[in-house]
A protein has these predicted regions:
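Structural signal for hydrophobic packing residues in well-ordered secondary-structure cores
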Residues: 1-4, 37, 119-123, 149, ...
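Histidine/acidic residue-rich metal-binding segments in metalloenzymes
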Residues: 1-65, 78-96, 113, 153
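Conserved, mostly hydrophobic/aromatic
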Residues: 10, 45, 59, 66, ...
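His/Asp/Glu-enriched, well-ordered alpha-helical/loop segment
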Residues: 33-42, 87-176, 189-191
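Short glycine-rich, flexible loops that bind phosphorylated cofactors or substrates
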Residues: 53, 74-75, 105, 176
């Protein structure tokens, strides 16, 4: 509150959080956090898969945002399609953004692939093709994320007075042809590999799919070197089931 920056934390991805809070505090996580005054409209909570209806009501009442991370939920088997209440959160007016969590959990940070999953998971889970249409998923990935960071007056959409954050896709690619329904193709067909140019606050940072602010080749080499060094220090066995040539 003193610095006006809000808070963000990861909570209730799996059963461990509610079980631990019930044992230690006698309440589920969101109820406990509300009682001690943590839940406010400048708070963004990542995951929120294992929440019950009472917690959902408290989240809606306090105005918190949720960063939905479908990729991690699927890989780590949080049960998001079985118990996740993201459709109910949306209907309750809770602001939903999309996250990619940590790469050690989700294995990638391509927001577009995560948006694809947001558009699809609950269609199947609830057998309802109207769940999270492409337009809603796109809004979550843009304005939803901006609201979660309390930055909706600066970013999240192309409007006069906001920062010029622009992503341009190369549409001469298989996922874009024939070019018919742009929003459907953006969410259901495209991913980060088709990005050609990126502007951040009006400054071009990507062109022809390559970063302009760093030496990419050197960066990839450093990533490989660092990864191999960490693996060697860990002493953990190689889990690859296929030979690598």
């Amino acid at each position: 509150d003193e610095h006006g920056v809000g808070m963000s934390f990861h909570m209730s991805p799996a059963k461990l959080d509610p079980e631990g809070f019930l044992e230690e505090f006698g309440h589920r996580p969101m109820i406990h956090l509300a009682e001690i005054g943590v839940l406010k409209d400048d708070v963004s909570i990542t995951h929120c898969v294992q929440v019950d209806n009472q917690e959902l009501a408290v989240m809606a009442e306090t105005g918190v945002s949720v960063a939905h991370c479908p990729t991690t939920a699927l890989k780590v088997s949080y049960g998001v399609t079985q118990v996740g209440k993201m459709p109910e959160m949306a209907m309750a007016g809770i602001n939903l953004g999309i996250g990619t969590d940590g790469n050690n959990a989700s294995n990638y940070s391509d927001l577009m692939r995560a948006t694809y999953l947001v558009a699809g998971l609950f269609k199947d889970a609830r057998t309802d093709p109207q769940m999270f249409p492409a337009e809603k998923a796109y809004e979550m990935a843009t304005l939803g994320g901006a609201r979660a960071m309390n930055a909706q007056d600066e970013i999240g959409s192309l409007e006069v007075g906001k920062k010029a954050d622009v992503v341009l896709h190369d549409t001469d690619r298989p996922e874009w042809r024939p070019l018919l329904n742009v929003m459907n193709q953006l969410v259901w067909s495209a991913d980060g590999r088709g990005v050609h140019t990126v502007f951040v606050d009006g400054t071009k940072v990507v062109e022809a799919g390559r970063m302009l602010t760093i030496d990419e080749d050197r960066f990839w080499a450093q990533c490989q070197e660092a990864g191999e060094a960490i693996t060697a220090r860990s002493g953990l066995p190689d889990k690859s089931k296929y030979p690598v040539l």
